[in-house]
Amino acid sequence: MIRNAALAVVLALVSAQAVATSDPLVGLLEGEGSAGLGAAVRIEPSMYKDAGVQYDLLPLLLYENNYVYLHGYRLGLKLQDTPETLIDAFVSHRFEGFPYDKLPASLAGMAGRDTGTDFGLSFERRGAWGAAFVELLHDVSGASSGSEARLGYFYEWQRSRMRTRAYGALAWRDATLNNYYYGVLPGEATATRPAYEPGSGMNVDFGVYADYRLTERWRLLGGLSITQWSKGVADSPIVSGGTQLKALAGFAYDFSPEKGAWKEKGRPIDVKLMYGKSTDCNLLPAMALQCTSTSTVDNTRIAGIELGRPFLEGMHGWPVDIVGNVGAIYHDENGLQQNAWAVHADMKAFYYGFPWDAHVRTRLGFGFGLSYAFRVPFVEARDQAERGRPTSKLLVYLDPTIDVSVGDLFGSRKLHDTYLGVGASHRSGVFGSSQLLGNVNGGSNYIYTYVQWRM
């Protein structure tokens, strides 16, 4: 239950001073109510023998206000935030473990080690000399159930358009954490792989991260770090060595509202109600309206509500609006498994530059974000089981739609911002390229109708 609540919060929706530690996404956004979207690639040699180099695609959904921050894989609640002190509680993804379907010879016959979700508390003290921080973390996902404590320091400087941050940290990991990820159980032992427990130990981390402001809204980001693992982990029969290098490179777009936007009436809220059915159609044919059948054997359904806040209107002078959304979708599994909720957050672009726009506003929309299902939907579990592949509660969320203004159709000015439309609710594992998403290669599609209005 704790795991579900923590991950659900992650999807709810970063300040320049929001997070201490080695997080490379600190400071990408500026201002209250800012949001951003981007992608990054993590590159690191696997700690496991003969497992090669791991490339992990990270979808970046970013949000900041005075109380919470989201960095794609880390969300925090700011308990105290002053120029000198930051205290926050957070949940974050742990990038460790190995999947069930891509085991090197050194891990053959071993049970998979799941990635984890940590709940943590952080204290940071700032000054002209830099910042010192302490973090306490504990796995709440039921994967390792291990704990970690970090003590570190970072210094940040700005030069022209580039902001750079160097850091160092000590990380003490308890035996439960190390034994889970780098130990060998007695039942997994072989002639060349003895049973082993690394026990607790201290890691040493150093790194440098930077982001470059290409334009007012586009950002490039990158970083390098090195970790010296404890001797207990380094000596494990399934570990390739005690030193690990990591690299990260990516980009982000800042959708922060322009200064003065909506200052007279405040930023409005969009409300959307939706209902739909599962489909065997792939996403692209469904988007092109070449496949719209919802006649399936399972006959599962969805119903949901979504709330949106506009961030940009007429972006760059184009007929494009940007809206940030959070929503909840109820999955009716038609008795095939227990019904359950899923929550999502996304940034969505609406294009309305059609020749007939002055008469009947028509919008093409495309949303990109993250979805967390409290129970993996039946259609995903079934399809992945048939292929012998893992499932994940956390996946990328895509939301292509087309709608028309009800007010324009019926000549009602009051209903101009009320829309009737059709869309496809799609959960995707991004072709198995993301450890954050459980290395899932697959997903689910639901075709739905909706009504949306502005408050």
PLM features per residue range, with description:
Residues 1-36, 50, 190, 196-201, ...:
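Cleavable N-terminal export/targeting peptides
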Residues 21-34, 67-84, 129, 158-164, ...:
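Short loop/turn motifs that connect adjacent beta-strands in outer-membrane beta-barrel proteins
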Residues 33-39, 59, 68-70, 85-89, ...:
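Transmembrane beta-strands of outer-membrane beta-barrel proteins
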Residues 41-47, 65-67, 91-97, 127-129, ...:
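Transmembrane beta-strands of outer-membrane beta-barrel pores
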Residues 46-53, 79-81, 112-116, 138-148, ...:
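Solvent-exposed loop/turn segments connecting transmembrane beta-strands
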Residues 140-233, 238-241, 311, 336-441, ...:
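Outer-membrane beta-barrel transmembrane domain signature
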